From Swiss-Prot:
GO terms for cellular component: ribonucleoprotein complex; ribosome. The keyword Ribosomal protein applies. The keyword Methyltransferase does not apply. This is Large ribosomal subunit protein bL9. Belongs to the bacterial ribosomal protein bL9 family.
Length: 151
């Protein structure tokens, strides 16, 4: 089934891309959700007419994503957690915790943009992949330190 994407979907393509998907996926998900339209002759002609506008929008989104990626690379992310003497954490650091730490430094991201295969369970420096846009990602080192308790 040939469709034209109305918005960027990370697994399929960018807005305005002509894609070929299985009929069930297109009919049951993409079309009802308004994420795509059928690639009829009139829709393809409309796409070609709006191509310059779509390309400008994509360029703007990419520029914003690259600025955020540069800002993330310059950041020093330190998260304090309760830890035992052996360096293991009581609990773990998840992508939600990383998202909250970034929000404290005025970088607002969705927790789904932070790719963390497993929660961090030890005091360590761990590289974490953050997807800030379509095919724009950066790696941030998250330093987990023991919470300093003052008696």
């Amino acid at each position: 089934m040939k469709l034209i994407l109305k918005e960027t979907i990370s697994t399929l393509g960018r807005e305005g891309d002509l894609i070929d998907v299985k009929a069930g996926y297109g009919r049951n998900y993409l079309l009802p959700q308004g994420k795509a339209v059928l690639a009829t002759a009139t829709n393809v002609a409309e796409l070609e007419k709006n191509q310059a506008e779509i390309q400008a929008k994509i360029a703007k989104e990419t520029a914003i994503a690259e600025k955020v990626a540069e800002k993330l690379q310059a950041i020093n992310l330190v998260i304090e957690q309760l830890a035992g003497d052996d360096g293991r954490l009581f609990g773990s650091v998840t992508n939600s915790d990383i998202c909250a730490a970034l929000a404290a430094q005025d970088i607002v991201l969705d927790k789904r943009q932070i790719i963390l295969p497993d929660p961090i369970k030890t005091v360590s420096e761990t590289p974490v992949l953050i997807k800030v846009g379509f095919q724009v990602a950066t790696e941030v080192v998250v330093k987990v330190v023991p919470l300093s308790t003052k008696a």
